[in-house]
């Protein structure tokens, strides 16, 4: 936002940020998106997503970046003809070039990533062996507590001037928390119905899993949607939903389709993935006029859906 502060039209930059950074870019590892992390906790190998999904990830991002380049170039050239002086020169002569501050927070970020990885590699298996049915809840509780400690340390140790320069505030976080509390309540009946009637749904092809998981992920949270469809696929093939690693090894194309549908199509609407709405709230706090809910879906429908159709024909 600060790098583009001199520009008149910035909303397209934020829209593509949501497409690429908040959603599609997180496909490679369980650290990138909650659906993949839930799969990791259920036995999917950590590096399986990297080795299996990197061609899909690379082609999708290449196409999206190319489309963004075309759109941004067109808008930038149009701005150049309507501003006094050179916009490029204004940006190049900015008094404060792009730089990074707050390097101490790298330790806290590393601590959070380590916590996430250890939860899947050691903590979760240990608790399952000793705590039975309480293992999942205890694992999440411990993980959340440790991550909160790192978050508080990061917030307290960061100089106030950095927060002020980045216009940091808790408003967007609170707004997203309230919204998704309501979404989680609304999605429980839909997911319960899917689990109860899932065995009667005749889904056999990977492309069907891709689009069905993607459709629900567009309007419900993508993490439980992923788990529901992965469990459905496992049950249809005689695999325990608690051991999705077997699904990854025996039916990799199906799990790949569910993974891509859940991660990619979370970008189809503001409520498909938690970061989407948070990015929008942060942008609006910085006085960037963002598309409405329907307006954003026009962007995603015009850009993402054709890309996903292409991915279907190539990979699924």
Range-by-range predicted roles:
Residues 1-9, 13-21, 38-54, 188-268, ...:
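Membrane-interfacial helix-loop connectors
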Residues 6-13, 28, 47-94, 260, ...:
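Juxtamembrane and boundary regions of transmembrane helices in multi-pass small-molecule transporters
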Residues 33-49, 115-131, 315-316:
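Transmembrane helix-loop junctions at the membrane interface of multipass transporters and ion channels
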Residues 71-107, 152-171, 289-290:
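Intrinsically disordered, low-complexity non-transmembrane regions of multi-pass membrane transporters
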């Amino acid at each position: 936002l600060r790098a583009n502060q001199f520009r008149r039209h910035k909303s397209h930059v934020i829209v593509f940020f949501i497409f690429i950074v908040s959603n599609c870019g997180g496909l490679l590892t369980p650290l990138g998106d909650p659906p993949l992390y839930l799969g990791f906790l259920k036995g999917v190998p950590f590096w399986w997503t990297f080795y299996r999904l990197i061609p899909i990830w690379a082609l999708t991002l290449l196409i999206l970046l190319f489309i963004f380049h075309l759109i941004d170039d067109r808008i930038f050239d149009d701005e150049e003809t309507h501003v006094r002086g050179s916009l490029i020169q204004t940006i190049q002569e900015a008094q404060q070039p792009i730089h990074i501050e707050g390097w101490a927070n790298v330790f806290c970020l590393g601590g959070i990533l380590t916590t996430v990885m250890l939860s899947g590699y050691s903590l979760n298996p240990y608790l399952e062996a000793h705590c039975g049915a309480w293992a999942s809840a205890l694992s999440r509780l411990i993980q959340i507590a440790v991550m909160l400690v790192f978050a508080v340390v990061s917030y307290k140790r960061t100089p106030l001037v950095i927060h002020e320069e980045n216009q940091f505030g808790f408003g967007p976080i609170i707004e997203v928390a309230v919204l998704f509390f309501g979404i989680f309540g609304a999605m429980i009946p839909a997911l319960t119905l899917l689990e109860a009637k899932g065995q009667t749904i005749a889904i056999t092809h990977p492309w069907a899993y891709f689009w069905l998981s993607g459709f629900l992920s567009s309007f419900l949270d993508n993490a439980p949607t992923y788990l529901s469809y992965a469990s459905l696929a496992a049950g249809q093939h005689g695999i325990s939903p608690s051991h999705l690693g077997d699904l990854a090894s025996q039916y990799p194309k199906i799990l790949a389709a569910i993974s891509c549908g859940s991660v990619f199509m979370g970008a189809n609407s503001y409520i498909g993935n938690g970061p989407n709405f948070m990015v929008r709230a942060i942008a609006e706090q910085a006085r960037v006029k963002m598309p409405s809910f329907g307006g954003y879906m026009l962007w995603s429908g015009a850009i993402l859906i054709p890309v996903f159709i292409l991915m279907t024909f190539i990979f699924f």
